[in-house]
């Protein structure tokens, strides 16, 4: 079990487990919400009803101070992390990192990982491997698969 008590869902969890999340208000009440995930959900939604739902979630989490939004430092540190992954640079704690061809595609996941770590939240995702790459730079990052979380 993760050491952090609070959690946030990656965008793919909202897609895969939409009905469970919508029908379990306690989940939403106990979690933090990433503005990056909110952006991904809003930008890809087709339904006006879903967009209204996301707006309500945004307001609730903003009011509850559980909406995690990257600041200028997060953007800068994330850019450096992606650069290191892309070029296979050394990390402070893990030495050389393997070069990635798709590092630029990981920007949103990196922002989610960084803000979750700073807020002491674990990330629930289907893309454990993508998030695992960031642990060389975010040693306190905790990642939980959807199977582990939902059983």
Residue ranges and their predicted role:
Residues 26-28, 62-63, 118, 138:
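Short, well-ordered coil/turn elements that cap or connect secondary structure elements
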Residues 39-41, 73-78, 147-151:
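A short acidic, often aromatic-flanked loop/helix-cap motif at beta-alpha or helix-coil junctions
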Residues 48-53, 85-86, 141-143:
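Short, hinge-like loop/turn segments at secondary-structure boundaries
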Residues 1-6, 113, 117-151:
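Acidic, PIN/NYN-like endoribonuclease modules and their adjacent C-terminal/linker elements
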Residues 67-129:
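Active-site neighborhoods of divalent-metal-dependent phosphate/nucleic-acid chemistry enzymes
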Residues 65-73, 142-148:
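Short acidic-hydrophobic, aromatic-tinged amphipathic segments that line or gate anion-handling sites
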Residues 1-60:
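Short, well-structured N-terminal submotif of metal-dependent ribonuclease cores
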Residues 16, 43, 76, 132-133:
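Alpha-helical elements of the RecA-like P-loop NTPase motor core of helicases
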């Amino acid at each position: 079990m993760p050491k952090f008590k609070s959690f946030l869902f990656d965008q793919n969890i909202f897609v895969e487990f939409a009905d469970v999340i919508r029908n379990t208000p306690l989940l939403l009440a106990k979690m933090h919400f990433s503005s990056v995930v909110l952006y991904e959900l809003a930008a890809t939604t087709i339904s006006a009803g879903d967009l209204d739902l996301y707006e309500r979630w945004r307001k609730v989490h903003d009011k509850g101070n559980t909406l995690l939004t990257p600041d200028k430092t997060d953007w800068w540190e994330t850019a450096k992390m992606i650069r290191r992954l892309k070029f296979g640079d050394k990390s402070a704690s893990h030495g050389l990192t393997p070069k990635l061809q798709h590092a630029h595609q990981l920007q949103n996941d990196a922002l989610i990982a960084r803000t979750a770590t700073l807020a002491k939240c674990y990330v629930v995702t289907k893309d454990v491997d993508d998030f695992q790459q960031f642990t060389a730079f975010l040693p306190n990052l905790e990642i939980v698969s959807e199977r582990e979380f939902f059983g």
